[in-house]
Amino acid sequence: MEKWNHTSNDFILLGLLPPNQTGIFLLCLIILIFFLASVGNSAMIHLIHVDPRLHTPMYFLLSQLSLMDLMYISTTVPKMAYNFLSGQKGISFLGCGVQSFFFLTMACSEGLLLTSMAYDRYLAICHSLYYPIRMSKMMCVKMIGGSWTLGSINSLAHTVFALHIPYCRSRAIDHFFCDVPAMLLLACTDTWVYEYMVFVSTSLFLLFPFIGITSSCGRVLFAVYHMHSKEGRKKAFTTISTHLTVVIFYYAPFVYTYLRPRNLRSPAEDKILAVFYTILTPMLNPIIYSLRNKEVLGAMRRVFGIFSFLKE
């Protein structure tokens, strides 16, 4: 029996899972994914921290990606699981704001960080002689700090606006977390100006970085094609193809969701697409970056004593 005990200031999250055995099975699957994502990203952060061979700009950026993914999935899954198991779909006004802030911060910051990682690979492969100068430790810190700062500022602006618009009597958000576009459907005022700002924000933090990433990857692939060293060509292609896989899996559903007009969106489709960038991507990223990377596998063998059958 579902209990919807809530005050007039609370929101209701209608959720993702049906209240039956299928929902229980899917929840168990999501909890397993959450566990794998937590272990995988925590292990990646630990490896990069303790292994001196991974103390390079590329892996420093990768450790930040793992941290963002860890916070990303922790923002949505625990609350979704608690609501499903307890039957209480409510979330407080403040809790909704906090969840929305962290979700948007991770979303924007990760998009900018992926752009920084693509730029790092572009410099390493296309301008290897100047790489130590252009990609210094200070530059790496600035890129990471800029990603977090810009993501937080953008998130704060969206969250403050979403919490200050007047809402109608119904406060049932047809989503499994406090997604701002889903919250706007409950507004009692015209939100076309804000929807336009969402479009602009999505373009600045997702679409334009995606175009920049694909452009730099194209330059890298062109340079890789003209490499004389077969081993170097293989290593460079593996690195860039791995990053492209992560980028496409993250950006495609995000851009498709947030750049569509309201009349072309459906809550059911938005929730399914959100599963990709809030649940699946944080689990897949450490797997993709580790299984195709000999240096990471070697670090696992040295630090954790696993994969000892693999040669570095």
UniProtKB/Swiss-Prot annotation:
GO terms (BP aspect): detection of chemical stimulus involved in sensory perception of smell
Pfam families: 7tm_4
Highest taxon of source: Eukaryota
Transmembrane stretches, start-end: 25-48, 57-78, 100-119, 139-157, 195-218, 236-258, 272-291
Keyword Manganese attached: no
Keyword terms of this UniProt record: Cell membrane, Disulfide bond, G-protein coupled receptor, Glycoprotein, Membrane, Olfaction, Receptor, Sensory transduction, Transducer, Transmembrane, Transmembrane helix
Name used for this protein in its record: Olfactory receptor 2L13
Organism field: Homo sapiens
